[in-house]
Curated annotation (Swiss-Prot):
A Pfam family hit: GTP_EFTU
Function field: One of the essential components for the initiation of protein synthesis. Protects formylmethionyl-tRNA from spontaneous hydrolysis and promotes its binding to the 30S ribosomal subunits. Also involved in the hydrolysis of GTP during the formation of the 70S ribosomal complex.
A GO cellular component annotation in the UniProt record: cytosol
Region annotation G5: where it falls in the sequence: 528-530
Residue ranges, annotated region (G1): 392-399
PROSITE patterns reported for this sequence: G_TR_2, IF2
Region (G2): 417-421
Name of this protein: Translation initiation factor IF-2
GO molecular function annotation: GTP binding; GTPase activity; translation initiation factor activity
Residue numbers binding GTP: 392-399, 438-442, 492-495
Region (G3): 438-441
Keywords, comma-separated and alphabetical: Cytoplasm, GTP-binding, Initiation factor, Nucleotide-binding, Protein biosynthesis
Region (Disordered): 50-299
Length: 882
């Protein structure tokens, strides 16, 4: 297979541009398109021969101007390397001479035909080119003459300055005329042979600057510059002179024009680059940094370093360090500085130094007071609903009055007919809202009444007309007066026989409550909560009193409030009933409540509907806290959850440390008292209640029971159902468990039976106190004991008119009878305690249903039965006295 070469390789060997070789190959009839086209050996030989025959020097005549111009162009294009390579290939060319002659003949015929077609255009171009060449030759001759004169004057000057160097120049100058006479490829070859250094195969291109007739200068012609301002330029002149003399030859017109064009472009680029560099130099000039003014006051903290002070003073840390060094203080940028040094530095700068006062963000009580004062001073205050607390003695009709206002029936579902936790409700009257707080009237709930008086605007004191002033009535008056809250007296039960409202008014005058009809300033309204008589008048008096007080709040600030009640719910976790006092509480707000923290996850109003925000004076129920807060704890909203978490954790830590400090250790001073206490008998109790307020009230009431030689010790108090941990704690402490409105879980009940732990369950507070006191005195005479006979699970419910709700239940264990007592337990909380109304098996009435069977059951006066409710059947059995 014959080896092939590409066009650019042939052009490289010949030292000719690629496009000229491509053009020549196309003229020879070769199928080539670009410099990447391939040629075989024969085609390469023809192509090289064509260039060789074109380079052969012939006497030019006027008739053959076209051939002479082509020879001149080709002669200039050939490089030294190409000539040398062609000389080395003479033997090869002689062997193939016949083929070359045939190819040259064919090529000549093609050129003749092409010349005939382009003869007019070619003759015009040749004439123009000849005129241009003559003009440029004349310019070069004038430039050469000028250069010769300049060279002679310089040579004379150099001879005077340095005779030895002038001799060397004579030798070089004597060579110059000989080199100028050489032309074309023969001149290049003669110069290469005369030089000592071998010349590589490079294309010889004249410098554009040297081909211009107008730009020949002394620097381009003179090989050695005179020793005037810059001696370095003198050494470079001989090389430039040699290059100029070597390349002083005829150049094709199109290359000369292209060189001139590229020279202009180069000059434009140089000017542009010069401008860019100058602009960059201008930009690089560093701008002077403007110093910021010093602050009027330096608010510092002890322990700051130079970097911290530099930021406050708007100065570099190095400047601060230098200033301190001048003041005699050796320090670095990271070393802490004391108070005196910082004040000395501030005095040096001529500004006042003020130490920063740290606020304890964990003290939310102070923060609560501050927010309250800011809200009162705010200019964006709006009217808010009044908060009214209903107070009075037990069973005087407080909850019945509230039921009348809300059109509900809360009092019938309360154990023993008494309220044992604070309830918060909001009522709309004549397009205005009133928030009511229902407080317990029992003596054990004194703290609840005190909390209700602290967060309220108006106190409605309910006094029964047939009962008169009672101890809790007097206590409520004291709470209201200590809180500075106005009192409106509602004399209730005027519809009952034997009611004497005037007698009640006379009794209240002893405590400073004088009716307006008798010349006083206390509003008295005679009402009947049961029939609704004069209730509307009472509401009008409440609104009138609220208008006089001009109750306002700023809804735009961060919310603050107070916990009314708190409990632990099985499905929702910690639940807190909160009264918003200032600002607007929104879902998602990070909050701290007492020693707990969290984010408001779900918020519901008093009607059980979910809300997104709570405005001032609105009672809401919130979830999302990490633990159950205490009743009366303050609620404060923080900027972010991270801050709220840190504050809550710090408060919990402080509370734990305070609890540890309260533990008394045995010392010589209290040794005798400690021995007396150890000799006393203790009744250990684990107390569990449904809400935090009830647990707190029970604990305080039980601890107040005084029996000589015996005392009550509450080892644990909490909210929620009785669980296994409570039973374990009671078993380890030899205590019994008191459950108030709660029930034990099945696991806890089984564990208590196995370990013999006594669990007492109550739903009325005074029964707890009576039983504990009787047990302490040793006079507990059990007459009847409650015995649980069975447990049922509600699987389906049906509502039947005139009958109520029928529960389809399955007896899990034990049995249930038609005469059994029944409790409805939902999520561990007792919802109702009553009696069985009817018991059926299929369609037949039965007396008893045992374990493993289904039954239909209805409960007296209770229809709110739901699927998965637990029913507990029990009987009261007589227990003999031991």
């Amino acid at each position: 297979m014959m080896a092939k070469k590409r066009i650019y390789e042939v052009a490289k060997e010949l030292g000719i541009e690629n496009k000229i070789v491509v053009k020549k190959a196309q003229d020879l009839g070769f199928d080539v398109k670009s410099h990447m086209s391939s040629l075989d050996d024969k085609q390469v030989s023809k192509l090289v021969d064509s260039f060789k025959s074109a380079n052969t020097t012939k006497p030019s005549t006027e008739k053959d101007s076209k051939n002479s111009s082509r020879k001149e162009k080709t002669k200039i294009k050939v490089s030294v390397g190409a000539i040398r390579r062609r000389d080395n290939k003479n033997d090869h060319d002689n062997r193939h001479g016949n083929n070359k002659r045939r190819n040259n003949k064919f090529k000549k015929q093609q050129n003749d035909r092409r010349a005939e077609r382009n003869k007019p255009q070619t003759e015009a171009k040749s004439a123009a080119r000849d005129l241009l060449n003559k003009f440029k030759k004349k310019q070069r001759a004038e430039a050469s003459e000028l250069n010769a004169q300049t060279e002679a004057s310089r040579r004379k000057w150099h001879q005077e300055q340095n005779p030895q160097r002038s001799k060397v120049k004579k030798v070089e100058n004597t060579r110059k005329p000989k080199e100028e006479k050489l032309e074309g490829a023969a001149a290049v070859k003669a110069r290469v042979q005369a030089s000592q250094k071998p010349v590589g195969p490079k294309i010889i291109k004249p410098s554009p600057a040297r081909n211009k007739a107008k730009r020949p200068t002394v620097k381009k012609v003179e090989p050695i510059a005179p020793v005037v301002p810059a001696p370095q330029k003198e050494e470079t002149k001989p090389t430039r002179k040699k290059d100029f003399t070597r390349k002083k030859r005829e150049v094709p017109d199109y290359e000369r024009e292209r060189s001139e064009h590229s020279d202009k472009a180069r000059r434009r680029r140089n000017k542009k680059n010069k401008r860019i560099n100058q602009s960059k130099e201008i930009k690089k000039q560093p701008t002077q940094r403007k110093e910021r003014p010093l602050p009027e006051t330096l608010v510092y903290e002890e322990g700051m370093n130079a970097q911290d002070l530099g930021k406050l003073l708007h100065r570099e840390p190095a400047e601060i360090v230098k200033k301190l060094f001048m003041l005699g203080v050796m320090t670095n940028q990271n070393q802490s500085l004391d108070k005196d040094t910082i004040e000395l530095l501030a005095a040096e700068y001529g500004i006042e130094a003020q130490e920063k006062v740290h606020e304890d963000i964990s003290d939310i009580d102070t923060l609560y007071t501050k927010e309250m004062e800011e809200s009162k001073a705010s200019k964006h205050q709006e009217k808010r609903p009044p908060v009214v607390t209903i107070m009075g003695h037990v069973d005087h009709g407080k909850t019945t009055l509230l039921d009348r206002l809300r059109h509900t029936n809360v009092s019938e579902h309360e154990a023993g007919g008494i309220t044992q936790k604070i309830g918060a409700y909001q009522v709309r009257i004549d397009d205005r809202l009133i928030t009511f707080l229902d407080t317990p009237g029992h003596a054990a709930f004194s703290n609840m009444r005190a909390r209700g008086a602290e967060i309220t605007d108006i106190v409605v004191l309910v006094v029964a007309a047939d009962d008169g002033v009672m101890p809790q009535t007097i206590e409520a008056i004291d709470h209201a007066k200590s809180a500075g809250v106005p009192i409106i007296v509602a004399v209730n039960k005027i519809d009952k026989p034997g009611a004497n409202p005037d007698h009640v008014m006379e009794q209240l005058m002893k405590y400073g409550l004088v009716p307006e009809d008798w010349g006083g300033d206390t509003i008295f309204v005679k009402i009947s909560a049961k029939t609704g008589k004069n209730v509307e008048e009472l509401l009008q008096m409440i609104l009138l009193q609220a208008d006089v007080m001009e109750l306002k709040a700023d809804p735009d600030q961060k919310a603050i409030g107070t916990v009314i009640e708190a409990r632990l719910d099985k499905g929702r976790g910690s639940v807190a009933d909160v009264l918003v006092q200032q600002g607007t509480l929104k879902v998602g707000d990070p909050i701290v409540v007492g020693d707990t923290f969290g984010r408001v996850r779900v918020m519901t109003n008093d009607k059980g509907r979910r809300v997104k925000k709570a405005t001032p004076s609105a009672p809401v129920e919130i979830t999302g806290l990490n633990d159950v807060p205490e009743a009366a704890d303050k609620l404060v909203v923080f900027e972010d959850e991270k801050t709220a978490r840190s504050v809550g954790e710090q408060r919990a830590k402080n509370a734990l440390e305070k609890q540890r400090e309260n533990v008394q250790h045995v010392t010589l001073d209290n040794l005798f008292d400690t021995m007396k206490k150890e000799n006393m008998k203790e009744v250990d109790i684990v107390l569990k209640a449904d809400v935090q307020g009830s647990a707190e009230a029970l604990q305080q009431s039980l601890e107040k029971i005084e029996v000589e030689g015996v005392r009550v010790n509450i080892i644990h108090s909490g909210v929620g159902a009785i669980n296994e941990s409570d039973v374990t704690l009671a078993g380890a402490s030899n205590a019994f468990i008191v459950g108030f409105n709660v029930r034990p879980t099945n696991t806890a009940k089984s564990q208590a039976d196995a370990e013999g732990v006594d669990i007492r369950l109550y739903n009325i507070i005074y029964k707890v106190m009576d039983d504990v006191e009787a047990a302490m005195k040793g006079m507990l005479e059990p007459t009847y004991e409650e015995k649980v006979t069975g447990n049922l699970t509600v699987r389906e419910t049906w509502k039947v008119s005139k009958i109520g709700t029928i529960a389809g239940a399955f007896v899990d264990n034990g049995y249930v009878t038609r005469d059994s007592g029944i409790r409805v337990i939902r999520d561990g909380i007792v919802k109702y305690d009553g009696k069985v109304a009817s018991l059926k098996r299929f369609k037949d009435d039965v007396k008893e249903v045992k374990q493993g069977f289904d039954c239909g059951i209805t409960i007296e006066n209770f229809n709110d039965i739901k699927v998965d409710d637990q029913l507990e059947a029990y009987e009261m059995q007589e227990v003999p006295v031991k």
